[in-house]
Amino acid sequence: MSDALKPLIGLAADRALTRTEAETAFAALFNGEATPSQMGGLLMALRTRGETVDEYAAAAAVMRAKCNKVSAPADAMDIVGTGGDGKGTLNISTATAFVVAGAGVPVAKHGNRNLSSKSGAADALTEMGIQVMVGPKVVEKSLKEAGICFMMAPMHHPAIAHVMPTRQELGTRTIFNILGPLTNPADVKRQLTGAFSRDLIRPMAETLKQLGSEVAWLVHGSDGTDELTITGVSWVAGLSEDGNISEFEVHPEEAGLPEHPFEAIVGGTPAENAAAFRALLEGTPSAYRDAVLLNSAAALKVAGVVSSLKEGAERAAESIDSGAALGKVTAVARITSEAS
């Protein structure tokens, strides 16, 4: 039992914790000092009252401090979603990561098993021949040689094991449902991050600012997806290099792309998703391709290599049609397979 945590649970139910108080509380969780009852008490107190930016930042900072880190270039970025949107779409952020890497931007992607898709990023990558359960040394080799890596959350955040049984028993969303995108082990400074709720995009942008990010787009689709949607409008909270956070909308037409019905981007089994993924990277036209082009355009804008979404979509299409994006998949599969 953690004596330090006990009074903080009571405080958390009544008021927002300060950054220091929240760091003390989450250190107790991640150090394995808290009992399951204390963990559950803290998580539910925060959820019931509603977490604050300081509490998000504190939890993420403690997780980052305890993670198995990865060395990455200064211009590397992450492309990730919270998951948990329940929409079962194709693996859009995963495909986007390879397209962006094919366009020359280093991508250090943080991910896990399926949450919102019928198969998550790790599931689709496994079907594509990529070994995901590899450690930091292999990840760094992949990033250095292929320009992209996939960091499996359990391989980099062992401290989370202390909390997993309690999370599973609670069976409801907690602060941990948004911590993945906030705790990239490569400490990237640029992010395209999807959220399962529009209400999260502003506080998540403010949290990333506190944690030292330079440029980030936090996005949510009007169809409920945790990415820029090809089915209509998306909402964005954008952190710019001057530290300002602005909120705006993105429409597919801004990238020169048509809208598609939601049914056209619904995924299936890991094998089905991997087949769609490969067809996309081989240049097959589809709603899936357009969804990936839209998100890739945004990522390239966040990376600072294009000035408009239309230019970004054109650059992304070139990455696909030249075979560069598929080449990145092949390279990562080779590097991770040689290491396993």
From Swiss-Prot:
It comes from the Bacteria. It is an enzyme of class 2 (transferase). One of its GO terms (cellular component) is cytosol. Mg(2+) 2 binds at residues 226-227. It catalyses: N-(5-phospho-beta-D-ribosyl)anthranilate + diphosphate = 5-phospho-alpha-D-ribose 1-diphosphate + anthranilate. Mg(2+) 1 binds at residues 93, 227. 5-phospho-alpha-D-ribose 1-diphosphate binds at residues 81, 84-85, 89, 91-94, 109-117, 121. Its cofactor is Mg(2+). Anthranilate 1 binds at residues 81, 112. InterPro entries: Anthranilate_Pribosyl_Tfrase, Glycosyl_Trfase_fam3, Glycosyl_Trfase_fam3_N_dom, Glycosyl_Trfase_fam3_N_dom_sf, Nuc_phospho_transferase. The keyword Transport does not apply. Anthranilate 2 binds at residue 167. Pfam families: Glycos_trans_3N, Glycos_transf_3. Pathway: Amino-acid biosynthesis; L-tryptophan biosynthesis; L-tryptophan from chorismate: step 2/5. Its EC number is 2.4.2.18. One of its GO terms (molecular function) is magnesium ion binding. Binds 2 magnesium ions per monomer. Keywords: Amino-acid biosynthesis, Aromatic amino acid biosynthesis, Glycosyltransferase, Magnesium, Metal-binding, Transferase, Tryptophan biosynthesis. GO terms for biological process: L-tryptophan biosynthetic process. NCBIfam families: trpD. PANTHER family: ANTHRANILATE PHOSPHORIBOSYLTRANSFERASE (PTHR43285:SF2). HAMAP family: TrpD. Catalyzes the transfer of the phosphoribosyl group of 5-phosphorylribose-1-pyrophosphate (PRPP) to anthranilate to yield N-(5'-phosphoribosyl)-anthranilate (PRA). Homodimer. Belongs to the anthranilate phosphoribosyltransferase family. This is Anthranilate phosphoribosyltransferase.
